[in-house]
């Protein structure tokens, strides 16, 4: 914990030497939404990430920023569970419809859209909105969980464990119509999705991954191959044949809980700091990042203020490295090296010394 906070402070201290030229136009959308699951507090994730210095960090990287603020979602007073199990379906459906409109507007305006969650059910809206302008997009899903249960296979009833099932075309004959979900148009196919960091996959999800040949890299795969090879294979799969926009959906619980304790479903044995930032640095290097979700930061689940701040600060590092922050430090964009003001300056200095 203390080590991760120190690393973050070191990176932050290097930023004043960062790029002096703007390289990205970034829209920031706060999505303070928690009804994709049952734990309170994840709706405060956007505020925590902002307070950790996100906008300042992006600005120091030279990004042009359009801040959409934090969205205010429609309240649904009577939202009975679907099938006596799936909670808050109408709230989730309506909120994602509203979010999709904002993401669509940001992307159509030429911005790379960063959505701050909020729980991971929000990916229904972010990917849907993104796909309206980039129907050929691909998705890199960094998470401890596969989040591909259907409303008929879920055990928890939480929609934050189901978002991808509503988006994948080939799954639609297995997905019932939930109230509030009629607006969704499935926009993904299995070859356009890669998972990184899985370590808590339910039996039905594993069946889906295998049946539809969805590429995934579990933590065991990362241990076996190394994160460099994982990223090489990810890019070969998604952008090897043709370049297309990347949607990065990053759940903070992909990291080991020692680094990101303030989250709702932590699982031991997660990504290290170096592995997590290598993922985002490599995605940035493609020049194809078009939208990014950073979800599941829950300050209320921290056991101390330091844990809450460390988790939010880690989220900022993930986003900043997606837009050009490098661990070797920032680099001023030099056009030329300075020269002495006159050709005799060195001779004059020598005379003074004599």
UniProtKB/Swiss-Prot annotation:
<keyword id="KW-0056">Arginine metabolism</keyword>
<dbReference type="InterPro" id="IPR006035">
    <property type="entry name" value="Ureohydrolase"/>
</dbReference>
<feature type="binding site">
    <location>
        <position position="120"/>
    </location>
    <ligand>
        <name>Mn(2+) 1</name>
    </ligand>
</feature>
<dbReference type="GO" id="GO:0032696">
    <property type="term" value="P:negative regulation of interleukin-13 production"/>
</dbReference>
<dbReference type="GO" id="GO:0007494">
    <property type="term" value="P:midgut development"/>
</dbReference>
<dbReference type="GO" id="GO:2000774">
    <property type="term" value="P:positive regulation of cellular senescence"/>
</dbReference>
<keyword id="KW-0835">Urea cycle</keyword>
<feature type="binding site">
    <location>
        <position position="265"/>
    </location>
    <ligand>
        <name>substrate</name>
    </ligand>
</feature>
<keyword id="KW-0809">Transit peptide</keyword>
<comment type="function">
    <text>May play a role in the regulation of extra-urea cycle arginine metabolism and also in down-regulation of nitric oxide synthesis. Extrahepatic arginase functions to regulate L-arginine bioavailability to nitric oxid synthase (NOS). Arginine metabolism is a critical regulator of innate and adaptive immune responses. Seems to be involved in negative regulation of the survival capacity of activated T cells. May suppress inflammation-related signaling in asthmatic airway epithelium. May play a role in promoting prenatal immune suppression.</text>
</comment>
<dbReference type="GO" id="GO:0002250">
    <property type="term" value="P:adaptive immune response"/>
</dbReference>
<dbReference type="GO" id="GO:0009635">
    <property type="term" value="P:response to herbicide"/>
</dbReference>
<dbReference type="GO" id="GO:0001666">
    <property type="term" value="P:response to hypoxia"/>
</dbReference>
<feature type="binding site">
    <location>
        <position position="202"/>
    </location>
    <ligand>
        <name>substrate</name>
    </ligand>
</feature>
<keyword id="KW-0464">Manganese</keyword>
<dbReference type="GO" id="GO:0019547">
    <property type="term" value="P:arginine catabolic process to ornithine"/>
</dbReference>
<keyword id="KW-1064">Adaptive immunity</keyword>
<dbReference type="GO" id="GO:0000050">
    <property type="term" value="P:urea cycle"/>
</dbReference>
<dbReference type="InterPro" id="IPR023696">
    <property type="entry name" value="Ureohydrolase_dom_sf"/>
</dbReference>
<dbReference type="GO" id="GO:0001657">
    <property type="term" value="P:ureteric bud development"/>
</dbReference>
<dbReference type="GO" id="GO:0032700">
    <property type="term" value="P:negative regulation of interleukin-17 production"/>
</dbReference>
<keyword id="KW-0479">Metal-binding</keyword>
<dbReference type="InterPro" id="IPR020855">
    <property type="entry name" value="Ureohydrolase_Mn_BS"/>
</dbReference>
<feature type="binding site">
    <location>
        <position position="296"/>
    </location>
    <ligand>
        <name>substrate</name>
    </ligand>
</feature>
<dbReference type="GO" id="GO:0032720">
    <property type="term" value="P:negative regulation of tumor necrosis factor production"/>
</dbReference>
<dbReference type="GO" id="GO:1905403">
    <property type="term" value="P:negative regulation of activated CD8-positive, alpha-beta T cell apoptotic process"/>
</dbReference>
<dbReference type="GO" id="GO:0050998">
    <property type="term" value="F:nitric-oxide synthase binding"/>
</dbReference>
<dbReference type="GO" id="GO:0006941">
    <property type="term" value="P:striated muscle contraction"/>
</dbReference>
<dbReference type="GO" id="GO:0030324">
    <property type="term" value="P:lung development"/>
</dbReference>
<dbReference type="GO" id="GO:0046686">
    <property type="term" value="P:response to cadmium ion"/>
</dbReference>
<dbReference type="GO" id="GO:1900425">
    <property type="term" value="P:negative regulation of defense response to bacterium"/>
</dbReference>
<dbReference type="GO" id="GO:0009410">
    <property type="term" value="P:response to xenobiotic stimulus"/>
</dbReference>
<feature type="binding site">
    <location>
        <begin position="156"/>
        <end position="158"/>
    </location>
    <ligand>
        <name>substrate</name>
    </ligand>
</feature>
<dbReference type="GO" id="GO:2000562">
    <property type="term" value="P:negative regulation of CD4-positive, alpha-beta T cell proliferation"/>
</dbReference>
<dbReference type="GO" id="GO:0043200">
    <property type="term" value="P:response to amino acid"/>
</dbReference>
<dbReference type="GO" id="GO:1903426">
    <property type="term" value="P:regulation of reactive oxygen species biosynthetic process"/>
</dbReference>
<feature type="binding site">
    <location>
        <position position="147"/>
    </location>
    <ligand>
        <name>Mn(2+) 1</name>
    </ligand>
</feature>
<dbReference type="GO" id="GO:0009749">
    <property type="term" value="P:response to glucose"/>
</dbReference>
<dbReference type="GO" id="GO:0071650">
    <property type="term" value="P:negative regulation of chemokine (C-C motif) ligand 5 production"/>
</dbReference>
<feature type="binding site">
    <location>
        <position position="143"/>
    </location>
    <ligand>
        <name>Mn(2+) 2</name>
    </ligand>
</feature>
<dbReference type="GO" id="GO:0006525">
    <property type="term" value="P:arginine metabolic process"/>
</dbReference>
<feature type="binding site">
    <location>
        <position position="253"/>
    </location>
    <ligand>
        <name>Mn(2+) 2</name>
    </ligand>
</feature>
């Amino acid at each position: 914990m203390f080590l991760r906070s120190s690393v973050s402070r070191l990176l932050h201290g290097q930023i004043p030497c960062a790029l002096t030229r703007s390289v990205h136009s970034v829209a920031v959308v706060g999505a303070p939404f928690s009804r994709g699951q049952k734990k309170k507090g994840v709706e405060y994730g956007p505020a925590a990430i902002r307070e950790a210095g996100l906008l300042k960090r992006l600005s120091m990287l030279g990004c042009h920023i359009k801040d959409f603020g934090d969205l205010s979602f429609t309240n649904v007073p009577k939202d009975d569970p679907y099938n006596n199990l799936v909670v808050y379906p109408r709230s989730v459906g309506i909120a994602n419809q509203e979010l999709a409109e904002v993401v669509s507007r940001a992307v159509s305006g030429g911005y790379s859209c960063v959505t701050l969650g909020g729980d991971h059910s929000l990916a229904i809206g972010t990917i849907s909105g993104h796909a309206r302008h980039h129907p050929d997009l691909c998705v890199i899903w960094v998470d401890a969980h596969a989040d591909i249960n259907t409303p008929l296979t879920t055990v928890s009833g939480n929609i934050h464990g189901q978002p991808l099932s509503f988006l994948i075309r080939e799954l639609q004959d297995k997905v019932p119509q939930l109230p509030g979900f009629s607006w969704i148009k499935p926009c993904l196919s299995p070859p356009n999705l890669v998972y990184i960091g899985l370590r808590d996959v339910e039996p039905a999800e594993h069946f889906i991954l295998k049946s539809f040949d969805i590429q995934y890299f579990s933590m065991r795969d990362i241990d076996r191959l190394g994160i460099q090879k994982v990223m090489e294979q990810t890019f070969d799969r998604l952008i090897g044949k043709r370049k297309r926009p990347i949607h990065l959906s990053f759940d903070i619980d992909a990291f080991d809980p020692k680094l990101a304790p303030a989250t709702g479903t932590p699982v031991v044995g997660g990504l290290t700091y170096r592995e997590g930032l290598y993922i985002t640095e490599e995605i940035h290097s493609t020049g194809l990042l078009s939208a990014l979700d950073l979800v599941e930061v829950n300050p209320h689940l921290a056991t101390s203020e330091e844990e809450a701040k460390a988790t939010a600060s880690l989220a900022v590092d993930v986003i900043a490295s997606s837009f050009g922050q490098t661990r070797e430090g920032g680099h001023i964009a030099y056009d030329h090296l300075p020269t002495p003001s006159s050709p005799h300056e060195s001779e004059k200095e020598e005379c003074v010394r004599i």
